[in-house]
Amino acid sequence: MNQRHLWTIVALSVTVLGTPAVGRTQTTKATAPAQQILASDAVKVGEFQSSEGKRTSDAVITSIHPHNLGGRRAATLFIRKIPVLTFVSSNPVASVETKVGAIGDNEGVQPYALNTEKSVQVASLGNLADARIQNRSQNDDPVKRASLVAAKINQLIRDNVKADQITVSWKGADSSLVASQSQNKSSSSQQKSERYTIKVKNQELVEINQNTRLADSTNNLANDALQATNRLRRLVGNASPLKEIANLPARSPKRSSNPIANLPQRIASSIRLSFQGIASFYGRGDGFAGRPTATGERFNPEAMTAAHRSLPFGTRVRVTNTRNGRSVVVRINDRGPFTRGRVIDLSTGAARVLGMIGSGVAPVRIEVLGR
């Protein structure tokens, strides 16, 4: 009898202890599919979900390089490793010391040279509406302003928007306090700043003004706006360049002590001399980077500069690759080329814009715009 009770107790114990094990096994089996679903929904940084639910890679098209420019915070927007726009804060940097990761501009080196280690990569910002949510107190942050434009550009390329829908027009004058450029640094004068708008399908992409300019600025907002637009048209979809700015009002030739610098003008009307020949480029692995040019400034391969045998230093010329129609405005700051049959030696950055890196040389048309 006792032995029968003992076996009964053992059987009940096995039954009770075995039940949780089965429960755990069933729970594990039920959880596994949920884990698989979560894994399939995960998207890595730099990738996005397509409309079919397939995961596709979104290459890094834009990058933002923060730096200091004239004592102010700045950020240069690169598209496909080519500098396009520079955003500058309206207020000077509080500290005079150069921060870690910032580039000073006291040695003649262009401050927007691409440094991939210190650049902010903008591969995919997801929902563009989220990128527009910004604190008003941060609107002066050049990196945030550049990031918003970069997000829009990435979205345009993702949506296969036609680049010929990128246009530029005159927006009008904006009354703003601009620090005087005279030696009296404490004074400020009320000036009307010209503004231009770059649009895509009649929606503003970016405004060109005193604090948002072409990366290699021509010191003329009209020229900056037109060149930035044409650079965007080419880099987004290889569209042909525009010849002039829309809605540009007629201006009287006099009313300013420096009308060339202050009044917008059509680039074509400022051509003083033109000629053709073969262009080459330098600064790519040849040891010239950082060395003094004929003007004494240090050579920056990514700056929009060029060498010519006789044009005065500081002269700006528009160089057009006659093979593909691409053009760029460069500043003469060096002497050369000294190879027979070549008329101009471009920086690596300018050559990249013209699409002649692979060939090394290209037939070009050169138009002298003045200084």
UniProtKB/Swiss-Prot annotation:
Biological processes annotated in GO: cell wall organization; peptidoglycan metabolic process
InterPro entries, per the entry: RlpA, RlpA-like_DPBB, RlpA-like_sf, RplA
Residue ranges, compositional bias (Low complexity): 177-191
Domain of life of the source: Bacteria
Region feature (Disordered): 177-196
Its EC number(s): 4.2.2.-
Sequence similarity: Belongs to the RlpA family.
Record protein name field: Probable endolytic peptidoglycan transglycosylase RlpA
Source lineage: Bacteria, Bacillati, Cyanobacteriota, Cyanophyceae, Nostocales
